C-alpha cells in the first residue's frame, strides 16, 4: 500500500513540473516559482498525511529527487526539494497587500491568495528573514527598484530596513512593511548610517577625504544603490563662486522623485558646527542661484565618520528639513546591534 501511495506522490510532483515546462516563455522563472510553491505543498501534505518516521520521510524526498533529476536534469537535488518545502511553509502563511504592486499585474494566485513578484533566487534570500514585516519590506523594495539577487543580498546585508526604521516613528515603520520606502519628503531619503563597504576602505581612518570621494566615484553605481530611488548623479567638486571666492561641493545629485538637488559633503572626522554652517551656505546658494522656480528646496547631507547629535540639533533651526548629518561605515554593520537599537527605540 505504501508503495502505491508513494508512486502516486512521485507521479504528482513529476506531472507538476511537466506541465510547468510546457508553459516555458518569457515568464519561465515566475512559472517555476509557483511550481516550487506547489511542489512544497505536495511534499508537506505527503508528510502530514503519513505517519512515517523522519528517516523514511528523508528517503521519500531522496527518491523523489532522483526521479526528478532523471526526468528533468539538474535543479531537483534533495536540498532544493527541502527549500521548496520551506518556501511553502513560509509563504502559505504570509499574505502581503497589493498596494505596493501594480494592480494590473496579471499573475497567478495560490490557493491562499498569494502572488509572487520576484524570481526564485530572490525568494531564497527572502526566506532567510524571520521577521515578517522586514521580509515584506525587502520584497516590495526588490520589486520596486528591480534589484537583482545580488543587489537584494547587499541591501539585506547592509541592514537597510533597520537603518531606515531607526529614523522613523512606529507608524512610519509599519508603513515600510506595507508600502516599502516612500519618497515624499526630504527625511525619506535620509539614512543613518550610510554603508560604504564597497569602497574597500578600512574601518580605521587612514585615508583622506579625497580618497573617500574617489572610491565613491569609482563605485558610483553601488553608491546610487545605497542612496535609494530617484537619484541621478550631477557632478563632483562642483564649484560655487561669489564675492570672488570659490567653494566646492563634494558631490551633487538630483532626486527626480523629490524634484530637488541633493548636496553631499564628506568628512572623515568628527562633525563640527562649522561644517554644518558651510553646508547651509551651499544649500542657500543652490536655492537662490541654481534651482528653478518649480523645483523644491535643496537638501544637504553631511556624511561624517562621527557626530554629536546635540551639536547638530543646536546648530540647525527646530523646523529644519533641508540639512542632515549622518555617520558612515566602511564595513557592514552588525544586524544584531542594529536590531537591539531598534528594539530600544520602540520601548521609548
Residue ranges and their predicted role:
Residues 1-348:
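Basic, low-complexity intrinsically disordered segments
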Amino acid at each position: 500500500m505504501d508503495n502505491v501511495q508513494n508512486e502516486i506522490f512521485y507521479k504528482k510532483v513529476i506531472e507538476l513540473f511537466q506541465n510547468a515546462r510546457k508553459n516555458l516563455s518569457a515568464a519561465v522563472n515566475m512559472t517555476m516559482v509557483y511550481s516550487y510553491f506547489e511542489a512544497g505543498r505536495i511534499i508537506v501534505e505527503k508528510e502530514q498525511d503519513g505517519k512515517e518516521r523522519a528517516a523514511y520521510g528523508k528517503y521519500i524526498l531522496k527518491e523523489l529527487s532522483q526521479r526528478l533529476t532523471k526526468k528533468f536534469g539538474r535543479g531537483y537535488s534533495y536540498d532544493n526539494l527541502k527549500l521548496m518545502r520551506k518556501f511553502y511553509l513560509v509563504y502559505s502563511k504570509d499574505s502581503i497587500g497589493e498596494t505596493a504592486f501594480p494592480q494590473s499585474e496579471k499573475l497567478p494566485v495560490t490557493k491562499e491568495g498569494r502572488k509572487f513578484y520576484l524570481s526564485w533566487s530572490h525568494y531564497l534570500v527572502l526566506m532567510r528573514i524571520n521577521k515578517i514585516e522586514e521580509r515584506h519590506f525587502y520584497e516590495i523594495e526588490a520589486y520596486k527598484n528591480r534589484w537583482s539577487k545580488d543587489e537584494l543580498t547587499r541591501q539585506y546585508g547592509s541592514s537597510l530596513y533597520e537603518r531606515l526604521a531607526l529614523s522613523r516613528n512606529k507608524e512610519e515603520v509599519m508603513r515600510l512593511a506595507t508600502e516599502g520606502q516612500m519618497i515624499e519628503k526630504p527625511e525619506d531619503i535620509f539614512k543613518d548610517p550610510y554603508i560604504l563597504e564597497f569602497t574597500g576602505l578600512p574601518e580605521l581612518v587612514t585615508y583622506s577625504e579625497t580618497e573617500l570621494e574617489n572610491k565613491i566615484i569609482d563605485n558610483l553605481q553601488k553608491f546610487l544603490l545605497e542612496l535609494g530611488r530617484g537619484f541621478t548623479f550631477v557632478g563632483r567638486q562642483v564649484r560655487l563662486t561669489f564675492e570672488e571666492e570659490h567653494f566646492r561641493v563634494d558631490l551633487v545629485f538630483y532626486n527626480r522623485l523629490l524634484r530637488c538637488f541633493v548636496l553631499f559633503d564628506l568628512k572623515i572626522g568628527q562633525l563640527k558646527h562649522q561644517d554644518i554652517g558651510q553646508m547651509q551656505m551651499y544649500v542657500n546658494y543652490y536655492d537662490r542661484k541654481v534651482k528653478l522656480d518649480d523645483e523644491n528646496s535643496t537638501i544637504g547631507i553631511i556624511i561624517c565618520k562621527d557626530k554629536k547629535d546635540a551639536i547638530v540639533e543646536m546648530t540647525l533651526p527646530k523646523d529644519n528639513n533641508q540639512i542632515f548629518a549622518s555617520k558612515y561605515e566602511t564595513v557592514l554593520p552588525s544586524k544584531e546591534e542594529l536590531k537591539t537599537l531598534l528594539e530600544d527605540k520602540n520601548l521609548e
